[in-house]
Amino acid sequence: SRGLGDVYKRQMEHTLRQAKECGGLHTLSKDKLHALVRASIEEYIDRVLPDLCEKSARFRYLFNRLCAAVERIMDEVSEELQSSDFEPLAFELAFGADGQLPAITIREENGTARVVGKVDRVDGWLHDGKLYLRVVDYKTGKKSFDLAELRYGLGLQMLLYLFTLKEEGQVLFGGHEIVPAGVLYTPAREPMLRCARDTEPEKIEKALKKELRRSGMVLEDPAVLQAMEHSALESPCYLPIAVKRDGAVTGSLASAEQLGKLSKYVDHILHEITQEVFAGNIDADPYARTPQQSACTYCEFASACHFENGCGSDRMEYIKATKNDEFWQYIDEVNGEGAHENG
């Protein structure tokens, strides 16, 4: 549930903050890290669940299971960051009136719109006077980065925050020139595996690692990839990339030029949405993966909307899978730059 997801995120953020104050994750033993997790959870119980002992046995069981899961997730995040030159620079970074950065502003002739939001974590790597930033979002569900969604103007938040940090983040991060290095969805959940009782522990661990692999898009630069994960160019474990036998790196990669084009595309979509809002266009026009997986599934306005696919003019628009070259060609078309040339 969303409530459990918030607990996961809160404990991870609090533990990472404490670890940073203690000198960084690389200075902590696993026992010390677990002690920080337990201290964070105890503080949460005192503040939010002082009556935990009075809760049902089922609730206490689920909460204790959650606490154990947080320890495992933090072990995994710790291992990732200890094998990386990127370090957490900000947690719960907010854009808006009460945030560390101003709201994202979209100006049109007939008005101004402002976007507010929050980034779970921002990691950075300072190299040759430039600060490479990546935006990290914790996901408690199965959400993953998807080019098809981007093509339909969905799932743009992470990229929007990344590109905004490039323009507005210097004052917050020491005045260095900022280079967008990517966006990552980090699983913040206890993975569930189906396996035989006699499955070897090594195979289980390998399967767990696979379930907890990040999704996203990262800068196609060998130095940056190796800074993100020291073994990225040989045997990546965390990043959404793979290495072929000939040493070529494949996966969810984008060149600096492509990220620039993506920034322009995101800006275009924002202006398009703003114009629609100012024009009063609020038609129900939902997207869907399948009839059972659509924008309507968790919509808070479903009871007022009464959209019914196939009834009258109500038609669900289905998201089609998008290949990498098709995606970049589409981005070029929207940006008015012609066909994308693959090098």
Regions found by a protein language model. Name each.
Residues 1-343:
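Structural signature of nuclease core domains in nucleic-acid processing machines
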